[in-house]
From Swiss-Prot:
List of residues binding ATP: G68, P69, E70, S71, G72, G73, K74, T75
HAMAP family, sorted: RecA
GO cellular component: cytosol
GO molecular function: ATP binding; ATP hydrolysis activity; ATP-dependent DNA damage sensor activity; damaged DNA binding; single-stranded DNA binding
Residues that span the membrane, as ranges: none
The protein's name: Protein RecA
Organism: Syntrophus aciditrophicus (strain SB)
Alphabetical list of PROSITE patterns matching this protein: RECA_1 (PS00321), RECA_2 (PS50162), RECA_3 (PS50163)
GO biological process, one term: DNA repair
Principal location: cytoplasm
């Protein structure tokens, strides 16, 4: 072996060769802080998650998988990403294979439902054909499929209730993703698959949880987000929301395995004010002394809930704090980000 300098040069040369051949972000140092500047993103609606993803949101022209237990916030997060894309004049589509989209809740989150393309397909094949046609059009910015578990193959629907249909859904997903992946990259469309968890039978060691639809989606996804409830948010005796934990279990464009937590309030979605308050307190932008929170030398609230409500009622202060948090974490200012075109 050569000297440390020779080895470092050899590694740098190998990295540059890999990046030329396979693209920027195909290899990186795990502790690297730098953002991959040329990756266009759509914010998630939760600033802490944008930071955890390493690039300020979900990347365009990639496949994303959001999975977790029931009522964990999967669809809520996907709807927030749609709302953020629409704020940037993006066109969004929602393939509702579960036939369960709550339109009034989507509106409360900020989705422009009048411009949202929606499809409620009868079979898995139909859902994925519609997805491919929309992606190939090149006009779409974001497509959400809710959910992989509800993409039932035609043969299973037409068969008898007790028929064994082994591996049909996995084969369907594998074939569809092979066709979709090239179109997604060319059209710069972000495709989000929402997925459910199942328990593997007979697993005594390791994690018994697995996602539906076989292994293809695990391989094709550039990001995989594990989202689940970590606690309840109460106002007196009433439960008004839930604390949600997201773990980035796969990330091809930034270092993976980062985690974050934020509040989801019922009927409102992700609490932007609560999320920014937590980040600001963590980095010292908002000072916390006992139960009191202070900003710019002035007290803004006693207790987290009161301070969160104060920030909701004073959006000008919230925007100032958000810009400081974004600057602290190397993200673009929000105004500059919103001025950029959708495509």
């Amino acid at each position: 072996m050569g000297t440390d300098g020779d080895r470092a040069k050899a590694v740098d040369l190998a990295i540059s060769q890999i990046e030329r051949q396979f693209g920027k972000g195909s290899i990186m140092r795990l502790g690297a802080k730098e953002r991959i500047e040329d990756i266009a993103v759509i914010p998630t609606g939760a600033l802490s998650l944008d930071i955890a993803l390493g690039i300020g949101g979900v990347p365009r022209g990639r496949i994303i998988e959001i999975f977790g237990p029931e009522s964990g916030g999967k669809t809520t997060l996907a709807l927030h990403i749609i709302a953020e894309a629409q704020k940037r004049n993006g066109l969004a589509a929602f393939i509702d294979a579960e036939h369960a989209l709550d339109v009034s809740y989507a509106r409360k989150i900020g989705v422009n439902t009048d411009d949202l393309l929606i499809s409620q397909p009868d079979t898995g094949e139909q859902a994925l054909e519609i997805a491919e046609t929309l992606v190939r059009s090149g006009a779409l910015d974001i497509l959400v499929v809710d959910s992989v578990a509800a993409l039932v193959p035609k043969a299973e629907i037409e068969g008898e209730m007790g028929d064994a249909q082994m591996g049909l859904q996995a084969r369907l997903m594998s074939q569809a993703l092979r066709k979709l992946t090239g179109s997604i990259s060319k059209s710069n469309t972000t495709v989000i698959f929402i997925n459910q968890l199942r328990m593997k039978i007979g697993v005594f060691f390791g994690n018994p949880e697995t996602t539906t639809g076989g292994n293809a989606l695990k391989f094709y996804a550039s990001m995989r987000l594990d989202i689940r409830k970590s606690g309840s948010i109460k106002s007196g005796q009433d439960v008004i929301g839930m604390r949600t934990k997201v773990k980035v279990v796969k990330n091809k464009v930034a270092p993976p395995f980062r985690e974050t937590e934020f509040d989801i309030l019922f009927g409102e979605g992700i609490s932007k004010a609560g999320d920014i308050l937590d980040l600001a307190a963590e980095s010292g932008i908002v000072e916390k002394s006992g139960a009191w929170y202070s900003y710019g030398g002035e007290r803004i609230g006693q207790g987290r809930d009161n301070t969160r409500n104060f920030l909701k009622e004073h959006p000008d202060i919230l925007v100032r704090i958000e810009e400081q948090v974004r600057s602290e974490h190397g993200l673009k200012p929000r105004l500059q980000e919103q001025e950029e075109p959708a495509k």
